[in-house]
Amino acid sequence: MSGVTTVEYRGRVAVITICNERKLNALDLHGYYELSERMREVATHDEVYVTLLTAKGRFFSAGADVSTIRDPPTTGEDDSGIADGGRRQWLQSFVAFNLNITQAFYSHPKILVVGLNGPVVGLSAALVSFADFIYATPSTFLLTPFSSLGLVAEGGASRALVQRLGVSKANEALLMSRRVPADELLQTGFVNKVFTELKGAKDDDVRFKELVLAEIDDKLGDHLVGDSLIGIKELIRRPEIDVLEGQNAREVFAGLGRFMSGVPQREFLKLASGEKRHKL
C-alpha cells in the first residue's frame, strides 16, 4: 500500500490527509509507515506551527487493513534456518512499524490538530489520542476492538488514550471493546468540539475540513506567536516522554506475544472472510 496520504503546506499550517476511501482509510504496515514519514517531514518545516491530520470520505480510519494479515505461524524458520515460530517476521513487521508510528506521533513537535471526519478504529484511534486538539463530526465514534481481536493495547493507547478519555470510559473502550460515540467523546474532553451543523451529506468531509481550518485560523492563527506555541507544547509534553518511551516498548512486546500465539491472526482472518463482524 502506497500513496495513501497527501501533505499540503498552507503557510503556518500543514495538512496531512489520509485518502484510502475504498478501504474506509484502513492502513497496512506500509500505510502507517507512510503516515509516519509525513509527520516527520512536516516536523522539519520551520515555517509550520500547526499540523492538521484528517481524512477523505465518511471514515477517518478503520484501523489496520485486516486483508493483509498473514496466516498464523507455527514452526516457521528465520533466514538462518532457526525455528522461531515466526518471531523474526513479527519483530521486523509489527514490532518495528508500531514502535515507529507511535513514536512519530508522541514526538511530533508541531501543534497537532486531528479532524475526525468520521469513525476512528484500532491503532488509528490510539494514535489520535496524542493530538493537542481534536475536532469531530456527529457521525464520529471511537472503537478500540483489541480485546475482541485477541490483541492488547497498542499505539500508546494504554497511556495516551486513558489520559485523554479518562480511566472509566477508557476501560469501556479498551477492555470491553465498546464503541464511544461523538457526544461521549465531547463530554469526556477527548474531542474539543463537534461540528453539529454537519448533517451527513456526501461532501461533509470537504465541508468539515473547511470548518476545522477556519477554527485553526481563528484559535491558533497569526495572533499567537508560533515559537511560543511550540515551546509551550514541548514543556507540557516533556514529563510524559520517558513514560511513553517505556510504554511503547511494553505494548509492542506484549503484542508480539499475542501474535506468536496465533490468536489475533485467526480473528483477523475471520473478519476478512466475513465469518466475524465487529460492530462497525
From Swiss-Prot:
Catalysed reactions, as listed in the record: a (3E,5Z)-dienoyl-CoA = a (2E,4E)-(5,6-saturated)-dienoyl-CoA
Kindly state one GO CC term assigned in the UniProt record: peroxisomal matrix
Q: In which pathway does it act?
A: Lipid metabolism; fatty acid beta-oxidation
EC number of this enzyme = 5.3.3.21
Organism superkingdom: Eukaryota
- Tell me, using the record's free text, what induces this protein: Expression is regulated by the transcription factor MSN2.
Q: What are the GO MF terms of this UniProt record? A: delta(3)-delta(2)-enoyl-CoA isomerase activity
Q: Where is this motif: Peroxisome targeting signal (PTS1)?
A: 278-280
Q: Per its record, how is this protein called by name?
A: Delta(3,5)-Delta(2,4)-dienoyl-CoA isomerase
Give the organism the record lists. Answer: Pyricularia oryzae (strain 70-15 / ATCC MYA-4617 / FGSC 8958)
